[in-house]
């Protein structure tokens, strides 16, 4: 139940907040928000949330980015 709520919040971000950015800013594929949805859906809120946090912390100009799916 909590897992669905977290995914719903991330989808709200994708739908209403992310489009407000003028340029695409995620260096990864899939995007960090989609990665968070995949991780929470697969591993649950605690482990998936930790994986998503690590991914977001890697998303900066000095990291090359690229293809990084949930494993």
Curated annotation (Swiss-Prot):
UniProt keyword list: Cell membrane, Membrane
Gene Ontology CC: one annotated term: plasma membrane
Chief location bin: membrane
Coiled-coil ranges per UniProt: none
Membrane-related topology note: Peripheral membrane protein
Compartments, as annotated in UniProt: Cell membrane
InterPro entries: Membr_insert_effic_factor_YidD
Annotated Pfam families: YidD (PF01809)
SMART domains named among the record's database cross-references: Haemolytic
Function, in words: Could be involved in insertion of integral membrane proteins into the membrane.
NCBIfam families tied to this protein: membrane protein insertion efficiency factor YidD
Family: Belongs to the UPF0161 family.
Protein name, UniProt field: Putative membrane protein insertion efficiency factor
